[in-house]
Regions:
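Cap/lid segment of the alpha/beta-hydrolase catalytic domain
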Residues: 142-242, 291, 430-441, 585, ...
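Accessory cap/linker subdomain of secreted extracellular hydrolases
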Residues: 89-93, 106, 157, 168, ...
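Conserved alpha/beta-hydrolase "acid-adjacent" motif
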Residues: 394-401
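Alpha/beta-hydrolase fold nucleophile elbow
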Residues: 244-256
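Short beta-strand/loop motif that positions the catalytic acidic residue
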Residues: 381, 387-389
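Residue-level detector of structural "landmarks"
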Residues: 22-30
Length: 724
């Protein structure tokens, strides 16, 4: 016999994908104790029923029962249509805590006030440090709720148990939960200041190194043996024993720096963690994220961030001052006037910013940087993982891709899912995702992600509602404005298209028969700007802006294909293999992949998915991807090597992955330059330590690309092989 008496409660049934009936039973109503004012330890609650715990004979009986059930309508969330495809069936979600969809910021703050109770705690870590933790518990005590936690260095305002979120700051409100849909559905939301930040005790360490795991008993007992993983573990233990009304399951999420902490939560291996979502996670600050790309310092981002974020915090504080103001109206002019990097401390920071000093002290990828790369620890991850990133994320695009690759290669199959959409940093959470920088994407891509992917992910793994069975990679094709799915990323069904750079400025699949060169003169006193015009600060929409201004410069060399006679979809990393020489002793190589639109292309505001590549006008040169390589690191990031003047050498590197459709009638273009300022610091083009270089070290030089049968090439991974 199969005893199913433990399934008491209202069953919820609806028609699922492909006409399959789906059913879920909510946990039977149980009394929930009010929050203990003295914060004494409470007995951990456990769920009364999970499908995984059912005997096989029960599962068979349940399967037979499902075949006879009739679909019953339940409250669901509205789902946006996706591209040219019909909207997929609404996933089975739990009965919402909040009856009405939360479509405005005011509706969100009203719902938090009406349906949640706020608590604040100082949660003890194993070394005695107390971390400020805010917990919002659903007022509905008839159900047990999973925890959904984020840990952050940016603060968890408003502070004070009687102060609730308001609608005055949309960006801050989006940090409350992964999406407003999840606030509607109901979770125990946990927000924590990481150690040493804001109202938490202890010392903050930027990109704190992870301890080697498994932790030995002496490290566990040692008060100095702490990292973000141990703090996550200790926090979860405390929550399970001190916050009533939970179902024993924990999800961890975060965007950017909190995204790193989410990834490290998976490393902590606490058994209560069932779902983790690192979104734009900070990963490796020397190779590809935030503050360095291939060894080149991301000058404007690093300086502007640490001039504010990096200020000393002697004691816990609820306020974070972010008020550094450049003394120039234009960001390009400000950093050019700053001069050599050492002037940042001399003129502005005055050695007060600890991590800026670390940046300056570690110019190469030494042990300091290796210890701060978490990816070697991404082994045997147990929770389900949803990695999210944006194709136009100017800060942590690389981190999303690298985190997925590292976890996927070291974790059981089908536990790691990657989602990449047409978003800037955090755009999937903070915007509709229907356009960016004047380029239309045809529909509200962020709504599709939040409602079709993210909400079902957490609902399935934390509540057991419905089934979440995505493809391993759910990816948006820019240029074509379509969602596509892949079994892995980069996809296996690609073929390399190697394009040779020819002397006549042509990109060709045919190798040149003669050896030639293309040279340009690069002056560090007049570096190539990141965008045309004046801007008081970085505008991260530059990642898809028109590059015609750069093509007109004599210090930028361009190569383009003939007009494409069919669509070409590039899917994966783009490989640069240049043979380059300089009459100096160092240089940077910047390569941009560009989509050149036909001269007769027109602006579009269409909402269909098969629109042209957006709202850029005819002849526009839309940036698809760009990357820099600091030449001295062409062999090894740890061991820089000078160029011998006049001697050609191989410089090989990859541009971060793309998934872009170059449409029929368009052209492919490559731009090559030696600076991209102030996105990246200037290379003096003299082989000296750049972080301590003097004005006299910055010298103009001529750089030369060698072309021909064994010359410079770029290789694109294409889904549909098309010869330009």
């Amino acid at each position: 016999m199969c005893d199913m008496s433990h399934l008491r409660g209202r069953q919820r049934v609806r028609m699922g994908v492909g006409g399959v009936l789906e059913v879920a039973w909510p946990v039977a109503a149980q009394p929930v104790r009010p929050m203990d004012a003295s914060r004494q330890r409470l007995k951990t609650a456990t769920p009364s029923f999970t499908v995984a715990a059912m005997p096989l004979r029960c599962l068979r009986l349940l399967s037979a029962l499902l075949s006879t059930l009739v679909s019953i309508t339940v409250p669901t969330l509205a789902i946006a249509a996706v591209g040219v495809q019909a909207a997929p069936p609404t996933p089975l979600l739990s009965t919402p805590l909040v009856p009405q969809p939360l479509t405005t910021d005011q509706a969100v703050v009203d719902a938090i006030a009406a349906f949640y109770t706020k608590h604040e705690f100082q949660v003890p870590m194993r070394d005695g440090v107390l971390l400020h933790t805010t917990v919002y518990v659903p007022k509905d005590e008839s159900r047990r709720w999973p925890f959904l936690m984020t840990r952050t260095p940016y603060g968890v305002p408003p502070y004070g148990v009687d102060n609730l979120p308001d609608a005055s700051n949309h960006r801050r409100l989006t940090r409350f939960a992964p999406s407003f849909a999840l606030i509607q559905l109901g979770y125990i939301f946990v927000h924590q200041d990481v150690r040493g930040r804001m109202m938490s005790q202890g010392t903050f360490v930027d990109v704190r190194p992870l301890l080697k795991r498994p932790l030995t008993s002496d490290v566990v007992k040692d008060a100095t043996g702490v990292d973000e993983g141990t703090d996550t573990w200790d926090t979860i233990e405390w929550l399970l024993h001190n916050v009533p009304g939970h179902n024993g399951r924990v999800g961890v999420w975060g965007i950017s720096y909190p995204g790193r902490y989410a990834a490290e939560a998976a490393v902590s291996a606490h058994p209560a963690i069932r779902a983790v979502s690192p979104q734009a996670p900070v990963t490796d600050w020397f190779v590809g994220d935030d503050f360095h790309h291939n060894g080149a310092l991301c000058l404007a981002d690093a300086f502007s961030f640490y001039a504010n974020f990096g200020r000393p915090r002697p004691t816990p504080t609820p306020t974070l001052k972010w008020d550094f103001e450049p003394d120039h109206a234009d960001v390009y002019d400000f950093y050019l006037a700053m001069g050599p990097l050492k002037n940042a401390n001399r003129r502005y920071l005055h050695d007060d910013i600890a991590f800026w000093n670390e940046l300056m002290a570690h110019e190469n990828r030494d042990a300091f940087w290796l210890a701060r790369d978490p990816t070697p620890h991404f082994t045997g991850i147990k929770p389900a993982v949803l990695v999210v990133g944006g194709w136009y994320d100017a800060e942590d695009l690389w981190g999303s891709l690298r985190t997925y690759q590292a976890m996927n290669s070291q974790t059981a199959k089908n536990r790691v899912t990657l989602v990449m959409g047409p978003w800037a940093h955090g755009g999937w959470a903070r915007s509709d995702g229907d356009s960016l920088g004047g380029v239309s994407f045809g529909h509200k891509t962020s709504h599709h992600y939040r409602e079709q992917i993210e909400a079902p992910f957490f609902e399935s793994h934390l509540k057991g509602s419905g089934s979440f069975a995505p493809a391993e990679a759910e990816m948006f094709v820019t240029g074509l404005n379509q969602w596509r799915t892949f079994d892995t990323w980069p996809p296996q069904q690609v073929k390399p298209m190697t394009l040779s750079l020819a002397d006549d400025g042509v990109l060709s699949t045919t190798k040149p028969t003669s050896t030639t060169t293309r040279s340009w003169f690069a002056d560090p006193a007049h570096p190539v700007p990141w965008m045309e015009g004046q801007y008081p600060e970085l505008d991260h929409d530059y990642m898809l802006k028109d590059q015609r201004f750069a093509s007109r410069r004599p210090d930028v060399v361009t190569f383009q294909s003939p007009v494409l006679d069919e669509d070409v979809v590039v899917a994966g990393p783009v490989t640069v293999d240049f043979l380059v020489a300089t009459d100096g002793t160092d240089l940077d190589v910047v390569v941009k992949l560009i989509d050149v639109m036909p001269d007769n292309a027109t602006t579009t505001t269409t909402t269909t998915a098969v629109a042209p590549a957006g709202q850029l006008r005819g002849g526009a040169q839309q940036l698809v991807r760009g990357e820099i390589m600091r030449g001295r690191f062409r062999d090894d990031f740890a061991v820089p090597r000078a160029f011998v003047p006049g001697q050609a050498e191989r410089v090989r590197f990859t541009l971060p992955d793309v998934l872009h459709g170059f449409r029929r009638g368009h052209r492919l273009m490559i731009q090559v330059q030696a600076s991209w300022f102030p996105l990246f610091d200037r290379n003096p083009q003299t082989f000296v330590p750049i972080h301590t270089a003097d004005d006299a070290d910055f010298v103009a030089h001529t750089h030369t690309l060698h072309l021909g049968p064994t010359g410079s090439t770029i290789t694109l991974p294409v889904l549909t092989r098309t010869r330009p």
